[in-house]
Amino acid sequence: SKGKAITFLEKNNYYYKVSAFRKNFKKKNGKYQHLDFQHLVDLATIDMYLRDTLLDIAINVEHFIKVELSRLITNNPDEDGYTIVQEFAVNYPTYYNSTYNRFRQSRYQKDMFLKRGSEIPIWALMEHMDYGCLLKLVELYFDKYRPSSLQKAVTLGDNSRHLRNACAHNNVLMVNVFRDD
């Protein structure tokens, strides 16, 4: 009913988000076919649960990439945790500077930064890397040592990052799902 639709839009969602799902329905003579507002509500609800699930998965993937990279660096006799930071700064200066500045300006971990001065180990720096920056570090390490355990992170990392960002920013995922082309 119209009343239920208004209540839903006032309390649960907003028109722009819900109306995006109409793209999943065919148009005939400029009018959507077999479209009922409840269908939009159902798709919005499913989309929300899908986003929440995928966000949890993507966050876990990011975490396990950090864990694996940290493990590899720690157990690598050719790495001291500082040299790779210098290499990262040279190879990816924009990413390094962004992370360094985020670390330096962090009001929550300022003590950690001040304690280290200019000698920042990779384990401390990784705590302040965004996902894209982390993937550049993975790429650097992978190109140097070729550990098979990072192969999927190198190959699929950007896909996971894009999906994580779409979910975290509450983007509509289930749009144009039923296209024939």
Predicted regions and their residues:
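Extended intrinsically disordered or low-complexity regions, especially N/C-terminal cytosolic tails and loops
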Residues: 1-162, 174-181
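Acidic/aromatic/glycine-rich contiguous surface patches that form carbohydrate-binding/processing clefts
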Residues: 170
